[in-house]
Amino acid sequence: MKAVIILGLVLLSVTVQGKIFERCELARTLKRLGLDGYRGISLANWVCLAKWESNYNTQATNYNPGDQSTDYGIFQINSHYWCNNGKTPGAVNACHISCNALLQDNIADAVTCAKRVVSDPQGIRAWVAWRNHCQNRDVSQYVQGCGV
């Protein structure tokens, strides 16, 4: 019985960690999910965004005390506007998705929501990390050697 409990705890700790993508693995995944060139945004810009928002970590979260919202997942999608965490006051949930879905190792839901974010007039500029680290920079290094 102790062995079953210990095994359960070990598996739980592995699950909680989530997936941390390798750079090229993420580039290939984002390309397969249709982000390369989506709304005119290069694959390199998407990978740069993910690097600076979450360091390629699907389980990344960041609480924002000002509006009591939280950013979720590989793209750090915010609960005030885009997803529902059941806690953020006045949440919009424009992606019509649970914020927990943005923390999955399978990032298809996160990509779908990111596509919704960039369909707004602000586009990819909605992400502060993209503006601070990727905008008007040579981002080709983020897909270099990835064969994409």
UniProtKB/Swiss-Prot annotation:
It is found in: Secreted. The active site is at 53, 71. GO terms for biological process: defense response to Gram-negative bacterium; defense response to Gram-positive bacterium; killing of cells of another organism. SMART domains: LYZ1. Disulfide bonds join 24-146, 48-134, 83-99, 95-113. Residues 1-18 form the signal peptide. Its main location: secreted. One of its GO terms (molecular function) is identical protein binding. Residues 19-148 form the C-type lysozyme domain. Keywords: Antimicrobial, Bacteriolytic enzyme, Disulfide bond, Glycosidase, Hydrolase, Milk protein, Secreted, Signal. Lysozymes have primarily a bacteriolytic function; those in tissues and body fluids are associated with the monocyte-macrophage system and enhance the activity of immunoagents. Belongs to the glycosyl hydrolase 22 family. PANTHER family: LYSOZYME C. This is Lysozyme C. It comes from Macaca mulatta (Rhesus macaque). The lineage of its organism: Eukaryota, Metazoa, Chordata, Craniata, Vertebrata. The gene is LYZ.
